[in-house]
Amino acid sequence: MKSTHPAISSVAWTSFSTGVNPAKHGIFGFMERTPNTYDIYFPNSKHVMSKTVWNMLRDYNKRSVVINVPSTYPAQEMNGVLVAGFVAIDLARASYPSSIVPKLKEMGYKIDVETQLIAESKDKLLDDIFLTLEKRTQAILHFLKNEAWDLFIGVFTETDRLHHFFWDAFERNTPHFGARFLDYYKKVDDSIGKIVEGMGDDVTLILLSDHGFCELKQEIYINYWLKTEGFLSFKTSPPKSLSDIAPGSKAYCLDPGRIYLNVKGREPNGCVSPGDEYEQLRNTLIAKLMELRDPETKTTLIDKVHKCEDIYRGKFSDRAPDLVIEPKHGYDLKGAFSKDLLLSKGNFTGMHTYDDAFVYVSQKNLVKNSVEIIDVTATILASLD
């Protein structure tokens, strides 16, 4: 299954839950621009501009239980139960109705893995990944059994955390962490088995991931590249935010590879004229990005560069990035403003991929040969028809 551009959780899970592309639901990344400014904000559930599948079903008096779907925080009123996922920070605001909070606290429910534990030890982080899965499974089984539902959605985001920090252990089958990686998946398999057992008869089962994963070789800092190529400069060094962008800058990047041109009439200090200059600059950036290579290995780093109109269609197209970079597998794109190098690597050893997300549907007649994550909403609705 194909994910979204970019293949990140806020965009992919919102596309999954609404069945439309980002130009219709309004979420293009973990950070968004405030229109006509250089200010950045973190979008949440209140910024989703399309109806979710559970609210579509609400119109037909169908009840849903939604556990841990990213970008559903803060929890909104619905017909059923919702426990928000990443980037939820407060259990009370993550829960609807509020009456479920005492039960969640009683079972020791964990909103997310405490990834900062990597600074102490890998084993402590892994222990927390296992614990979070245990508590997530406990909550899912509780609501599966004790709530009435027509649609039930439960998400295990712990797999994402495991892959980001321990993909190298899996790839290399290292004795300790490689074994624990596989042990975790045995636990996932056990959890899925318990969920299937608790679903009851005549229920369509859909399993999916919002993106794929592969080994992370290097992180690419696109704003550094834009600076070295003369397309971007800042008034301060190091810059604290995008608002430090200097007059005359022609382009900038937000995570994970969204390039925005500094357009006259759109940005406060825009210098790129709409029309021919805009198109010429986009074409120049595409050509240069496609030539970008790892200085040491000489490997090309970019697979494709998409123009916004080729991948986004909808009423919020004017908020879309002008270009979206799709990297080669192994090269993760970053939008940091203060980095002074092209390539680097942090704690992550695994990265998201676009073209190999997973989907399984137990009702075979609902599946077509070419599937994108935005198709899942229609599949859910068809299964309930």
What is the role of each PLM region?
Residues M1-V20, R63-V65:
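Short, structured active-site-proximal loop/turn typified by the sulfatase FGly-forming signature C/S-X-P-X-R
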Residues S9-V11, M78, Y221, L226, ...:
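Short, solvent-exposed loop/turn segments at the edges of secondary structure
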Residues V20-T174, K250-T300:
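His/Asp/Glu-rich, glycine-adjacent segments
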Residues S50, L57, K235-V367, I373-T379:
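Active-site neighborhoods of enzymes that stabilize oxyanions during catalysis
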Residues V81-A84, D168-N173, E219-E229, G275, ...:
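Short secondary-structure boundary/capping segments
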Residues L151-V155, I206, Y360:
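Structural motif
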Residues F165-A169, N173-K194:
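Extended hydrophobic/aromatic segments used for targeting, binding, or gating
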Residues K186-L226, L301-C308, F316, V324-E326, ...:
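Metal-dependent active-site segment of extracytoplasmic phospho-/sulfohydrolases and closely related
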